[in-house]
Amino acid sequence: MSRTPIIAGNWKLHMNPEQTTEFVDAVKGKLPDPSKVESLICAPAVDLDALRKAAEGSNLHIGAENCYFEDEGAYTGETSPKVLKEMGIDYVIIGHSERRGYFHETDEDINKKAKAIFANGMKPIICCGESLETREANKQEDWVVAQIKAALDGLTAEQVSSLVIAYEPIWAIGTGKTASSDQAEEMCKTIRETVKDLYNEETAENVRIQYGGSVKPANVKELMSKPDIDGGLVGGASLDPESFLALVNYQD
């Protein structure tokens, strides 16, 4: 099974609409063929319209950083998955460690969001990963397997084949500790084996798994050489056009 690599920038709470347009103008003629590498930017909700307009006709896919699990209602401050689809959004990040940590999102919330995203014809990027405390207790596999089982509950094999899972070791973010490419591969392999156990081998071979711990131009080739790593969920290194281009064109 040949999986198309997917490099996704997660801008977090950075960039305004003007900066967004400037960024896309700088990269859109230099992106790889989407059959080789899928290039994706996930932007703050306030930038999505500018991002979509600037990227029109290019190889850049558009993603949101979050959404709610209801299409409409009295949910002040939330983002509707139905409206995201109407805007032309392709992917939505859910379950990011910052959402779980700062905003107390639960596995149940993330599962509901995954179902809402599929119901509206988009694809979720489901994040998972363990803390330093969990890693030092050697419980990382149990932790991540439990997250995956909860996130995928009730999804069909066809749906799981089309989504993206992003492994982000929380212990390697801002701690001075670094996950080696072998550690990243070990966990991505565990995730794939979990999907196989829950569904079947074909589904496990289809699902794309990203690594999301300080991916940058200097380490992207080594990470992408690993058999179970199909892409990167990139934070800071995706904010600069030249850096983002170096990441998505890592095969050159």
UniProtKB/Swiss-Prot annotation:
Does the entry feature the keyword Cytoplasm, yes or no? yes
A GO BP entry? glyceraldehyde-3-phosphate biosynthetic process
Family membership? Belongs to the triosephosphate isomerase family.
Q: Where in the cell is it found?
A: Cytoplasm
Q: Which GO terms describe its cellular component?
A: cytosol
- Please state the pathway this protein functions in, per its UniProt record: Carbohydrate biosynthesis; gluconeogenesis; Carbohydrate degradation; glycolysis; D-glyceraldehyde 3-phosphate from glycerone phosphate: step 1/1
Molecular function terms, GO-annotated: triose-phosphate isomerase activity
Q: Name one Pfam family in it.
A: TIM
What the entry lists under Gene3D superfamilies is as follows:
Aldolase class I (3.20.20.70)
InterPro entries xrefs:
Aldolase_TIM, TIM_sf, TrioseP_Isoase_bac/euk, Triosephosphate_isomerase, Triosephosphate_isomerase_AS
Q: Which reaction does it catalyse?
A: D-glyceraldehyde 3-phosphate = dihydroxyacetone phosphate
**Can you say what this protein is called?**
Triosephosphate isomerase
Which positions does UniProt annotate for substrate binding?
N10, W11, K12, G174, S214, G235, G236
Annotated active site? H96 (electrophile), E168 (proton acceptor)
| Protein source organism | Lactobacillus acidophilus (strain ATCC 700396 / NCK56 / N2 / NCFM)
Q: What top-level class of enzyme does the UniProt entry assign?
A: isomerase
Q: Oligomeric state and partners? A: Homodimer.
Enzyme Commission designation: 5.3.1.1
Q: What does this protein do?
A: Involved in the gluconeogenesis. Catalyzes stereospecifically the conversion of dihydroxyacetone phosphate (DHAP) to D-glyceraldehyde-3-phosphate (G3P).
Q: Which keywords does UniProt give here? A: Cytoplasm, Gluconeogenesis, Glycolysis, Isomerase
Q: Does the keyword rRNA-binding apply?
A: no
The record ties this protein, via PROSITE patterns, to: TIM_1, TIM_2
Question: Which CDD domains does this chain map to?
Answer: TIM (cd00311)
